[in-house]
Amino acid sequence: MVHPFLFLQFFRHLLTPLGISEGGADAIAYTWLIIALLLIVSILATKGLKSVPGKMQNFMEVIIGGIENMVVETMGEHGKPFFPLIATLALFILVSNLIGLIPGFFPPTANINTTAACAVIVFVTTHIVGIKEHGVKYIKHFLGPILWLAPMMFFIEVIGHFSRVISLTLRLFGNMNGHELVLMIFFGLAPFLVPLPMMLMGVLVSFIQAFVFMLLAMIYIQGSLEEGH
């Protein structure tokens, strides 16, 4: 879906000479739009914090507190250092998903490059954390408990870890791109009443996909913190 907004035209003009497609340029434009939106909301929510919170502060405290509780419940207290990363990914993916429900807008998570970037961030963080936590012993995560099976287990584990990137990428991309295509079809057939149930379902899908990505990211990072056997 192509949306000829002025800021999209600017990004296309800027990025297409670099060999980036119009779809990729649009995804980058919406990504920066969402980053700016999240920054503005964060500044407004944290400006003049009060012991008795206002509506904006209370709303943000509920969201951030909910994510923090989920991180602690899933990863334990030692998961708190990863809360900023998990919360950032969750909020970015959620807003990216929801923005596609606004007529004329396109979710950057419906572009495979965006979802791949998020997946790579989780993948790299997982192994940096594992190496930092265990040092050379981190390789035990890839060798398994039986010594003579270690070469085969290493090969299988490496494939498994790389498949995480693929699964995180394709799950989010497939669901959001598929939903966008369905919305386009329904808007074309009946542009008023029929798409409304699909848009409501889109809200549910947006929350579920953000939650699944966040949950898997926590599980993967938690796994790298555990002792290898």
From Swiss-Prot:
It is a multi-pass membrane protein. One of its GO terms (biological process) is proton motive force-driven plasma membrane ATP synthesis. It is found in: Cell inner membrane. GO terms for molecular function: proton-transporting ATP synthase activity, rotational mechanism. Keywords: ATP synthesis, Cell inner membrane, Cell membrane, CF(0), Hydrogen ion transport, Ion transport, Membrane, Transmembrane, Transmembrane helix, Transport. It comes from the Bacteria. GO terms for cellular component: plasma membrane; proton-transporting ATP synthase complex. Belongs to the ATPase A chain family. F-type ATPases have 2 components, CF(1) - the catalytic core - and CF(0) - the membrane proton channel. CF(1) has five subunits: alpha(3), beta(3), gamma(1), delta(1), epsilon(1). CF(0) has three main subunits: a(1), b(2) and c(9-12). The alpha and beta chains form an alternating ring which encloses part of the gamma chain. CF(1) is attached to CF(0) by a central stalk formed by the gamma and epsilon chains, while a peripheral stalk is formed by the delta and b chains. This is ATP synthase subunit a. The lineage of its organism: Bacteria, Pseudomonadati, Thermodesulfobacteriota, Desulfuromonadia, Geobacterales.
